């Protein structure tokens, strides 16, 4: 069956949900990994995309996402502060560009950003573009088309809005907003001309079937940059005692995400420090071809130089010429 699916993918077809379930439950794992590797190289070549983020506003979020240290609903040790200045953001962006990183995102806690905050962010992005040629991304919650247009007009080319998990599982993790609201933001971002980056977190108690559901969901909304975070349970949050994924579960998930999303950048993200170096290498071999590098929000990330060296050792070229979404549905 694996060979049949590989041939179908190469000829423009797709796996079915039922086939993905069978691969997860009964396929020889090494054969699955090898197939995902070949599909990665066939559709994506040897380019490896890098980006970095800065937590431009931290804590006091009114939303109740059960995994998140930023929520005011939970007693965590997260540092709380308002928006960083344009100067600080630009200095961080320039530093990351000097490390060879191609993209830089301002990430802010909260359900949304006020118009005043959007104007402050616009100033930050203008300052960044004056200082460096790094590509600008933003992750500021649920935004209207008007606010997204302001960001786009000030240099933001990519908007990040994680769908987080499978539609069947999301309501059990968050009650203060819906995935449909996230989809509305993604559609608005595309209407103003932005690319979209959207992924989520695995290991929050979802089943493998729900991970497959999630991968197909992202495919259905034409996402071509998919951060795959691994839950790092944070004391004080409802998920603090969630048991970790096994290494095999993680690698199988990466392989299935690759077969379901053959043309996407699958991106190392938060929580990956839990993985051994050998598993990180294996994940890159199987299908990871991008990374959020540096320190990631409230969990431990990975230093840029180390990530780039790892990608090169795994046969990739670290490049800034990795645009996605040549065309997409509005």
From Swiss-Prot:
Cofactor requirement: [4Fe-4S] cluster; [2Fe-2S] cluster
Annotated InterPro entries: Aldolase_TIM, BATS_dom, Biotin_synth/BioAB, Biotin_synthase, Elp3/MiaA/NifB-like_rSAM, rSAM
Presence of the UniProt keyword 4Fe-4S in the record: yes
Residues engaged in binding [2Fe-2S] cluster: 105, 137, 197, 267
TM helices/strands, residue ranges: none
Binding residue positions for [4Fe-4S] cluster: 61, 65, 68
Reaction(s) catalysed by this chain's protein: (4R,5S)-dethiobiotin + (sulfur carrier)-SH + 2 reduced [2Fe-2S]-[ferredoxin] + 2 S-adenosyl-L-methionine = (sulfur carrier)-H + biotin + 2 5'-deoxyadenosine + 2 L-methionine + 2 oxidized [2Fe-2S]-[ferredoxin]
Pathway: Cofactor biosynthesis; biotin biosynthesis; biotin from 7,8-diaminononanoate: step 2/2
Iron-sulfur keyword on record: yes
Alphabetically ordered keywords of this record: 2Fe-2S, 4Fe-4S, Biotin biosynthesis, Iron, Iron-sulfur, Metal-binding, S-adenosyl-L-methionine, Transferase
Cofactor note: Binds 1 [4Fe-4S] cluster. The cluster is coordinated with 3 cysteines and an exchangeable S-adenosyl-L-methionine.
Taxonomy, superkingdom: Bacteria
Annotated GO MF terms: 2 iron, 2 sulfur cluster binding; 4 iron, 4 sulfur cluster binding; biotin synthase activity; iron ion binding
The protein's role, per its UniProt record: Catalyzes the conversion of dethiobiotin (DTB) to biotin by the insertion of a sulfur atom into dethiobiotin via a radical-based mechanism.
PANTHER family hit by this protein: BIOTIN SYNTHASE (PTHR22976), BIOTIN SYNTHASE, MITOCHONDRIAL (PTHR22976:SF2)
HAMAP family, per the entry: BioB (MF_01694)
Family recorded in the similarity comment: Belongs to the radical SAM superfamily. Biotin synthase family.
Assembly with partners or alone: Homodimer.
Protein name: Biotin synthase
Source organism: Porphyromonas gingivalis (strain ATCC 33277 / DSM 20709 / CIP 103683 / JCM 12257 / NCTC 11834 / 2561)
